[in-house]
Amino acid sequence: MTSTRGLWDLPQPVIDLAQRANGWVAERSVEARSLWAKSGDGVNFLTLPEHLRDSACAASLVFHVWLSDSIKGGLAGNLGLSVKELEKLVLWLSASHDLGKGVRKFQCQIELREDVRHLVSRVRDAGLSLDQGVDELNVDKLPHSVASGGIIRDWLEETRGF
């Protein structure tokens, strides 16, 4: 069976989030909007705020269209949350999962690729330093997922006391 769901059949919460999220991207600083997340072919790329927005919007679509009410209820119950709180958690996790792509090590990793090195130049042109500290230079690889986890952990500790 094929789906006949069209663009205009999207649940209203998905549409509302997409509209708010576009404004959120536009409100980010020049520096934040200079960070790249998906290099693509170098012409068609996504900035970090755009990628985080797209991730949240995709999660919203999955939450509202694909997950059944019984699955949402079961997950929410197991976590001690309401379904609305579960939705907020899912969207937050989706939107924050790649924050580690903003670290210097990640931003510099494509600098030697001629087709996309201009993305690194955009970061510097926005006034951000990409000079890596001793700790970063002594690490051969720093997966952005590990950096994301550290950023989220530190933020939760500083702002929420977790």
Name what the model sees in each region:
Residues M1-F162:
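Metal-dependent phosphohydrolase cores
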